[in-house]
C-alpha cells in the first residue's frame, strides 16, 4: 500500500504515553516513505513498524519530529541528508531491518540530537566491532540497543577506531571505505520503492557518469552552506541520482 496523501489523511494521530503526538502507520505494507509533507510537521513521533520500507530517506523538512519507529522493515540504506531533513530526531528504532554495512550508519552522525538508537536484529549488529564503531562514529548517542553507553566503552571505542593524532585506525578505515563504494551505487528506485534498473547512457541528450566520492562530498558541503532552498533542492536531486552530466 503506497503512502498516499489520502492514506495519511485518514491515519490515526493521537497523544501517546510520552505525551507526544504520534502518527500511526503500522502494518500497512508501505514500500517507501513519501508524501509526509502533507502532515504539515504536526507530529512528534511517527510509527512505521511492520512495513516494507527499504530506504530510510525521502523525508521533507520535519523540525518537530523526535521519534521514528521503524522496526520490522527491510531498510538497508540511509539517506546521507537525513540529519538535514530531521534535525530534531532524538530516538530511532531500526530493530530487525536489513542494514548490513556499518559504514551506512555514518549518515546518522548528522542527526545531532539522536540519543536513543536501536539496531538489534540487523546484520550490521552482528559485526565484531559493531558497538565500538557506533559509539565512536555517533558520539551523540547515549543509549544503544537499550544499553546505556559507559565512559569506559567510549574510551575503548576511541582506542580501537582512532589513532593518537585523530586519524582512523586501519580497522576503522577498512569499515569506512565501504561508504565510498556504496555511495557510488545509489539506486534511485530503491528510494521510491520501485524495482527498475538503471541503464547507463544518455538522458535528455546528455551523457552522464557516476559521481566520485570527492564530488559527492563537495555536493554535501555545498548543501550545508547553501542558503537558497531552490539550490538545495537541485543539489539534493543530483546527490540522490548519484550521477553528473558531462
From Swiss-Prot:
LRR repeats: 19-40, 42-63, 64-85, 88-109
GO molecular function terms attached to this record: U2 snRNA binding
Subcellular location: Nucleus
Chain ranges of the LRRCT domain: 122-160
Major localization listed first in the record, in broad terms: nucleus
GO cellular component: post-mRNA release spliceosomal complex; U2 snRNP
Keywords of this entry: Leucine-rich repeat, mRNA processing, mRNA splicing, Nucleus, Repeat, Spliceosome
SUPFAM superfamilies (alphabetical): L domain-like (SSF52058)
PROSITE patterns recorded: LRR
Record GO biological process: mRNA splicing, via spliceosome
Domain of life: Eukaryota
UniProt record similarity statement: Belongs to the U2 small nuclear ribonucleoprotein A family.
Job description of the protein: Involved in pre-mRNA splicing.
PANTHER family: U2 SMALL NUCLEAR RIBONUCLEOPROTEIN A
Assembly with partners or alone: Associated with the spliceosome.
Name under which the protein is recorded: U2 small nuclear ribonucleoprotein A'
Species this chain originates from: Mycosarcoma maydis
